Amino acid sequence: MTTTPISNVRNFSIVAHIDHGKSTLADRLIQTTGGLQDREMKEQVLDSMDIERERGITIKAQTVRLRYKAKDGKDYILNLMDTPGHVDFAYEVSRCLAACEGALLVVDASQGVEAQTLANVYQAIDNNLEIVPVLNKVDLPAAEPDQVKQQIEDVIGIDASEAIMVSAKTGIGIPDVLEAIVTRLPPPKGDRDATLKALLVDSWYDVYLGVVVLVRVVDGVLKKGDRIRMMGTNAAYDVERVGVFTPKMVNVDELGPGEVGFITAAIKEVADTRVGDTITDDRKPITEMLPGFKPAIPVVFCGLFPVDADDFETLRGAMGKLRLNDASFSFEMETSAALGFGFRCGFLGLLHLEIIQERLSREFNLNLIATAPSVIYKMHLTDGQEIEIHNPIDMPDVVKIAEIEEPWIEATIMTPDDYLGAVLKLCQERRGTQKELTYVGSRAMAKYELPLNEVVFDFYDRLKSVSKGYASFDYHLTDYKAADLVKMQILVNNEPVDALSMLVHRSRAEGRGRAMVEKMKELIPPHMFQIPIQAAIGGKVIARETVRALRKDVTAKCYGGDITRKRKLLEKQKEGKKKMRQFGKVDIPQEAFIAALKVDS
């Protein structure tokens, strides 16, 4: 394979909102440049997980090296980085963008700019990327290219007069996209003779090769047999193979400056290769890392318990396997009196949580219960200590707490005008404060500050339902603020159920508690004695429902006769029930847990 001069290399990524067609566009580019034969083409080539293909989302970043002969007769190498579009994976997006010099901004011509498009475009602009707007789905009858062009200029502030019209599905305009990549995007810069410096873009686990690391070489040359060092973890490895994806893995002799490819080096765990790390030569390392590296920090936590206690070991193995491929997912063992043994898991966000849960049930056939998601709270104690907790069970005694702080986010919500009222009302209900509200054509863009605690529960589902699915939402963490939070417990027959305790804002506690006890009342079957179900904060009960007892008609065999005879039997029954209530155990069915945790606040 002859080395291509650096001026003929182009690294670009595709930035788009979910469902605007970037994976389909990637398919067309691969097909047009002959990366795969027609028989090997399938929908969304780059989305390798079934779940990615089904939900139409990209989770792990992927890359492809395409060879393209341009109209000027030169051969170019185009490295396409397919980035995830969802907010939970924003850090992966930022690393992908750091490895590129340009980006294609794909906007659906029938839907216009959405919230996540904005977030990703701003990241691209921050990384000084050249941006080429592409309007997709122009073949749809609902497409309004001129309005969307105007919208791109108004909202994002980049010139869209030369936006390329394409339909990725039918293949219209694909050659124009390839030409634009070559003519409008800059080549990478890099010094071949300098010391090796490369960016670790992503990594995943392969059963045969160990960890496969995706790299973008900035300076120097990376070849087989080199001894490399990861600067973030300070571990050294010997490179075993170097290659590129065309999307198939193809071995090459070396990767020069500006090139993107993969290496394997007998690395055991993905956790050893942190996304955004800098790779250098072990013999003569560079002194400073590439900017922007930060370890993945979980934001949302929840407990996962197997419905069948015998599945615990299977669950442990399954989580270990997922952890091989996803370093941002963390877990530790936890026990619950109500649910038995399970794990407390940390995720990047709600989509990440859903995906992990779905993969556990789908790939490993596990039946799971998830407890209510929670976030990390900071507790300032009266003795001057500061602790962080994410499990309501670990909360110290109320008298010891001086102040509780919770994380806040800044959310950007784009919605059609008609649903704006409902969306603003939802944000207000969730203790949000409005920062700004702007209009672009018939769409409104609202910026809100919201507590993350209110968002993790079911905010996204509610937002979709109040806006008939049209609103889009994107957020990033800002800081911690003091809050009046209380620990609410659910008591069944005067016994606290640990799996249902949660930290809520005092103003929302009664509503949330009442909804939960009502739901539990419907689902706990009647026992031989009456069962009180209570929601309590500390010693104060804020809501109560009672499941009535089943009782036998003890007076059935008395015909007529004296009332005292009947009374004696009823009193005797009453005594028995009282005794039962002291010693009886209540069986709470799994459905009751699941329903109580799904309660719509």
From Swiss-Prot:
GTP binds at residues 19-24, 136-139. PROSITE patterns: G_TR_1 (PS00301), G_TR_2 (PS51722). The keyword Cell membrane applies. GO terms for cellular component: plasma membrane. Its EC number is 3.6.5.n1. Keywords: Cell inner membrane, Cell membrane, GTP-binding, Hydrolase, Membrane, Nucleotide-binding, Protein biosynthesis. It holds the Pfam family LepA_C. It is found in: Cell inner membrane. It comes from the Bacteria. GO terms for biological process: positive regulation of translation. Residues 7-189 form the tr-type G domain. Its main location: membrane. It is a peripheral membrane protein. InterPro entries: EF-4 (IPR006297), EFG_III/V (IPR035647), EFG_V-like (IPR000640), EFTu-like_2 (IPR004161), G_TR_CS (IPR031157), LepA_C_sf (IPR038363), LepA_CTD (IPR013842), LepA_IV (IPR035654). SMART domains: EFG_C. It is an enzyme of class 3 (hydrolase). The keyword Membrane applies. GO terms for molecular function: GTP binding; GTPase activity; guanosine tetraphosphate binding; ribosome binding; translation elongation factor activity. It catalyses: GTP + H2O = GDP + phosphate + H(+). HAMAP family: LepA. Required for accurate and efficient protein synthesis under certain stress conditions. May act as a fidelity factor of the translation reaction, by catalyzing a one-codon backward translocation of tRNAs on improperly translocated ribosomes. Back-translocation proceeds from a post-translocation (POST) complex to a pre-translocation (PRE) complex, thus giving elongation factor G a second chance to translocate the tRNAs correctly. Binds to ribosomes in a GTP-dependent manner. Belongs to the TRAFAC class translation factor GTPase superfamily. Classic translation factor GTPase family. LepA subfamily. This is Elongation factor 4. It comes from Afipia carboxidovorans (strain ATCC 49405 / DSM 1227 / KCTC 32145 / OM5).
